[in-house]
Every structure is written in structure tokens, then in C-alpha cells.
Amino acid sequence: MQVKTIRMLRLAASVLAGLLGCAAWAQTAPEPVNPNATPEARALLAYLNSISGNAIVTGQHNYPNDGARWTNLAHDLTGKYPGLFGQDFGFSAGDDKDSVLSRPAMIEEVKRQYANGAIVTLTWHEVRPTDDEPVTFHESVQGHLTDSEWQQLLTPGTPLYIRWCSQVDVVAGYLRQLRDAHVPVLFRAYHEMNGSWFWWGGRPGKDGSAALYRQIYDRFVNVHHLDNLVWVWNVNAPGGSAGPIADYYPGPQYADLVTMDIYSEFKQQFYTSMVELAAGKPIALAEVGKLPTPEVLEQQPRWTYFMTWSEWIQTANTLDQANAVYHALRSLNRDDPRLAVPMEAIRKATASRTGVRVSGSNSQ
């Protein structure tokens, strides 16, 4: 047996032992910010914490109406399925209408991907609460709220707050389907909030973008009881119109993971700032354009996953670059036993506890 395979199996065995109840391992696992988090959500967070510093899960984003198109392309390019499957509740390019009609099919694809062994992460390019869907992406998602509208949005009982609740409640219904199917989700709310290109972003301070993040956390956790969510806080790499990251942090009691989007240069200062702000929580590259090299991953070992943005896997990277990171020893693809064994353990534990069997399918 090759040395690489032996090393992979040894690490998989140690991670599985932890998932099955190793006391020492459990003591080092972070407590979810939601005290009522499901066993699956807790296990997923504990797994990500366990690989921090040792390995990184490969990931790929997909547009709502694309199913698993870009995940399948990553496989075609590298021969490996990404370990993390990313989807979106609302993203359309240019003047196309928002992809709200794709949500039911997207949820079914998420279930299939999880059953086949992938970690699931979901993003939401939410339209302004002043707008009714469907609308165009540029007009609404990249629109603007006045300061007065922003204050109304954060004030319970106002017409704009009520509209926002109605909008959020629709997406909560889809997330509830995943909760009831025992699918844990890395949920990335109001991403890139330190940037000025989305209506929710570019507002630093306690009453700014972070306050809206806390508001959706409260509604999803305390009203809808979406206890399958692992809460992912996210910023863009600082520079240009993206402000200092600490000005947007909602507080450690609202974030299970601390993540950054980097589309070009993986500066060491970005990594260091995330490690410091996370204060022991797992960190990740929630979006990348250009893939990190194996050398970058060795120098920045605490990233727990990366997610390439849809077509960028091909348009911003050469075939050699994609294969270099997907076949790096540190990288965990879907079939890697260091990922596949723990994910199977989580699904089997669900079946044992609830009688609900989450099994793989022929769909990729």
C-alpha cells in the first residue's frame, strides 16, 4: 500500500474515533453558537475543527439554476469530486431575473450531494426588502438602501422590517426541508459585508451590516428553529472598497466559522488577520477565484475549506493549477477517506438515532 494511502487511512481512523465519542477529541471541539444545534451540525463543526492545521476540503459553488454543473466540471477537470458542494438561494448575472424558481430543484440537489458524501454550504444573494421577486441582480442585490430605510429595516414593527421578515421566512421554509432531512448546512449570511457592492454591505459598526447578520440569526434560530445551520460569517479580502474586517464582526456568539473571500492574491496578512479574529474558531476560504497553490496551503494551514466560484474553476485557472491543488496531499476530495469516513459516520448516526436513512444515490 502506498505511503500516501496509509497516511490518509490513519487520519480517517482518528477522525472517525472522535466522531464516535472519543472524550479527549470531543473536549477540544468548539461549542456551536446555537446551543440547540442538531447532532449533525455539531458533528460537522467538530470535524472542521479537527482538520484545522492538517487538511483542507476542496469545494465548488454552483448557480441556483445550474444544479451541480460546476461541481461536475471540477470532476471532469481533475478526476475528483469536490468535498464541499456550494449552492445559492438567489444569484443571476446581468439582467436575468433572480433564480427563485430554481429553489425547489436546488434543495433536492443539495440532498443528493449530501447523501453522496459532500459537505453542504449555502449562500443567499438576497434581494432588497424594498423589492418584490423576481427582480434583476444588478437592480436589487447590488442596489442600495438609504440610511432611513436601513434604520427601518433594523426596527421591529416597521413596514420594511415586516417585509424583510416575509422575505426571510420564505427561505427559512427551504432550510426547514433540509433540517427535517437531517442535512447540516454551512450557512453564509450576508457575505462580503465589508464591501460596498451589495445592499447589505459597507456599513461598519454595531448598527451596521453586523446588526443585520445578528437579526437573521435571531429569526432563523429563535423563530424558525433551524438548528441544522452552522453559522458562517464572511468578509471580502480588505482593500479598495472592502473595509477593515473587524469593523463588521457580529461577535463570537454569532459565528461558528470565520471566513474570507479571496479572488487573487492569498496574502499572509489576510490569513493572519483571520486567525487572530477567529480566536480558535475554524477559518475558511468561502470563495476563491484563482485557486490557492499547494505551497500557499502549506504556509496557511488553518484554512479548513475553499470554494471556487462557479465558472472560475476553468476561466481563472489552468488545468495544471486545478489538478495541483485537487491532488495535493493536504486536499480532501469527496472520495478521500479522511472526509468520506467521517461524513458516512454522521449519516449512519442519523439513521441509528432517528430511523431516517440518508444514503447515497447514483446522481453525482
Language model: regions and residue ranges:
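Bacterial N-terminal signal peptides that target proteins for export
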Residues: 2-13
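Bacterial N-terminal signal peptides
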Residues: 12-23
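N-terminal module-boundary/linker segments of secreted carbohydrate-active enzymes
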Residues: 27-90, 95, 99-100, 351-363
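Substrate-binding cleft of secreted/luminal carbohydrate-active enzymes
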Residues: 56-61, 281-363
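Aromatic-lined carbohydrate-recognition surfaces of secreted/lumenal glycan-active proteins
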Residues: 59-61, 188-190, 213, 217-243, ...
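Aromatic- and acid-rich polysaccharide-binding/catalytic face
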Residues: 87, 245-266, 308-309
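Substrate-binding cleft of extracellular glycoside hydrolase catalytic domains
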Residues: 94-222, 226
